[in-house]
Curated annotation (Swiss-Prot):
Protein name: tRNA-specific adenosine deaminase
Cited PROSITE patterns: CYT_DCMP_DEAMINASES_1, CYT_DCMP_DEAMINASES_2
Cofactor(s) essential for the protein: Zn(2+)
InterPro entries for the chain: APOBEC/CMP_deaminase_Zn-bd (IPR016192), CMP_dCMP_dom (IPR002125), Cytidine_deaminase-like (IPR016193), tRNA_aden_deaminase (IPR028883)
Organism: Haemophilus influenzae (strain ATCC 51907 / DSM 11121 / KW20 / Rd)
One GO MF term attached to the UniProt entry: zinc ion binding
Cofactor note as given: Binds 1 zinc ion per subunit.
Active site (UniProt): E63
Keyword terms of this UniProt record: Hydrolase, Metal-binding, tRNA processing, Zinc
Start and end residues of each CMP/dCMP-type deaminase domain: 9-121
Subunit-structure text: Homodimer.
Length: 173
């Protein structure tokens, strides 16, 4: 696994689309993460964005949803020769699903130093005991992906401060 794999114009195009999908998550109050699954002919076969809050489902991460959609579209849970683009480094749960789906390649934008399973926090695919290997390319549009998340969490913190101040002012009356 080499994080410095060559990034193509197509990789950037798909990551920009994943960022658009992340906007859908944000519009729903979800953490803005988007994912796009592409087959070897460069056709989009699955897409997803975070829906854990909306669906009350801790597994409804963008990656999982994109993999599920892709599997349904090709009617096979093995997503051989496909590439998954995701705006944030996958967590361990998503890394497990990625492994089982047998995708050929993973491309992600921002690193996740809290829960990232592809090198930032954990090294899920580096274990020699894994029964599948895949190519990983990291850092595609990393700045844009990271900024989207930073802006979201900054806004969320500001909203919490306002809410807390409002509750305090109401309790003081």
């Amino acid at each position: 696994m080499d994080a410095a794999k060559v990034r193509s114009e197509f990789d950037e195009k798909m990551m920009r689309y994943a960022l658009e999908l992340a906007d859908k998550a944000e519009a729903l109050g979800e953490i803005p993460v988007g994912a796009v699954l592409v087959d070897d002919a460069r056709n989009i076969i699955g897409e997803g964005w975070n829906l854990s809050i909306v669906q009350s489902d801790p597994t409804a991460h963008a990656e999982i949803i994109a993999l599920r959609n892709g599997a349904k579209n090709i009617q096979n849970y093995r997503l051989l020769n496909s590439t998954l683009y995701v705006t944030l480094e996958p967590c361990t749960m998503c890394a497990g699903a990625i492994l089982h789906s047998r995708i050929k390649r993973l491309v992600f934008g921002a690193s996740d130093y809290k829960t990232g399973a592809i090198g930032s926090r954990f090294h899920f695919f580096d274990d020699y005991k894994m029964n599948h290997t895949l190519e990983v390319t990291s850092g595609v549009l990393a700045e844009e992906c990271s900024q989207k998340l930073s802006t979201f969490f900054q806004k969320r913190r500001e909203e919490k401060k306002i809410e807390k101040a409002l509750l305090k002012s109401l309790s003081d009356k």
